[in-house]
Amino acid sequence: MYHYTESGLSNVYLKNGVTVEVVDGEEYTSIDDMNGLHSAIAQTIVNTNKPLAHDEFKFLRIELNVSQKMLANRFGVDEQTIARYEKGQTKIPRTTDAALRALYMESQEKNNPVSYFLDLLANTQAEEAAKIIRLEEVEDHWEKVER
C-alpha cells in the first residue's frame, strides 16, 4: 500500500490508483483522480464518529478552499484560534467540529443537519491512536476499504 502523506494526514494508505515512475534517477508518483481521492478522504473524515484531529481539521478547511481568516470569520473567532486548532495547540470545540463537518457536506451538496454531527460526536471518546484510512480506486472513483 502507498502511504499517502502528501495529503497532510499521516493515516492515509492507498491500495491502488498510484503509479510510481523513475525518470533520470528521480522517483515520480502520480495518483489517479486526485479530486475524487480527496473527496473520499474528506467523506471518510466527516463520517467518522470521533472528534476531528488537528490535521483533519486543516485538511477539511483546505478542501473547502477557505483561508484561516475566512473560516475564523465564519466561526466568530480570531485567525490565531483556527491556527491553534490546526497545530494541535488548542482543543477543537465540539460545536466547531460539527460546524466544519456541516460546511464540508454543504459544499458537496450532501446536507446533514448540524445536530447529526453533534450526535455523532456526543458519546465518543477520542482514540489515542489515529484511525488508518484505507482507500482503493474502484472503476472511476475512490472507496473506503473495510478491513
Model-based region annotation:
Residues G76-I92:
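Recognition helix of helix-turn-helix/homeodomain-like DNA-binding domains
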Residues I62-Q80:
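Short, compact, well-ordered microdomains
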Residues Q89-R101:
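Short, basic-rich loop-to-helix N-cap that marks the start of a DNA-contacting helix
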Residues M105:
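Mixed-charge (Asp/Glu-Lys/Arg
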Residues K50-V66:
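Short, amphipathic alpha-helical "recognition" segments used to contact nucleic acids or chromatin
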Residues F57, L71-A72, I82-Y85:
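Conserved hydrophobic/aromatic packing and binding residues within compact polymer-binding modules
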Residues M1-P51, E109-R147:
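N-terminal flexible/basic segments that precede or flank functional cores
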